[in-house]
Amino acid sequence: MKAQRVRLAVAAGTVILAASVVASGQPPSFAGDWVLTSISPQRQGYDQFWFGTEARVTQTDTTLVITRVSPPPLREARFTLGAESQNEYVVNGQKLVRDSRATLSRDTLLISTDTTPADGQRWLSNILRWSLDPDGTLIVGDTEICGKGECPSVVTTLKFKRK
């Protein structure tokens, strides 16, 4: 009887330990209403396509949606985590197709995007790297790929706070 209690206690302890390991391994939640607090380096005319200065992010285990709230134009991007997603926009009267791959790994979300303008020439145009600081600040590293490699890429770091 005593041996059975010991086995049950050990089994219960193992379940509790396993549950705490799984809980601590949960991916971060980027969901919320976000407001831009800083941008580095400052670049005249720079405007993050999906975020702008204010955005709403909704997230499930398998999807992520970014809704640009401000400044206009309102834009929405929908991603399926671990798969390719396509979003279409009209920019300056021209159709723009953005094919993205969103991957959540450890505490980082990576979104790599190919852009296809009206001329049909698709290229890797952008890589976003998201993470959360311990204080809850959303850090977005935005790497813009210049054309088809004929000039240097530009990396901009954006910081957002929850509204």
Regions found by a protein language model. Give the residues of each.
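Bacterial N-terminal signal peptides that target proteins for export
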Residues: 1-12
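Intrinsically disordered, low-complexity regions enriched for glutamine and histidine
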Residues: 2, 24-25
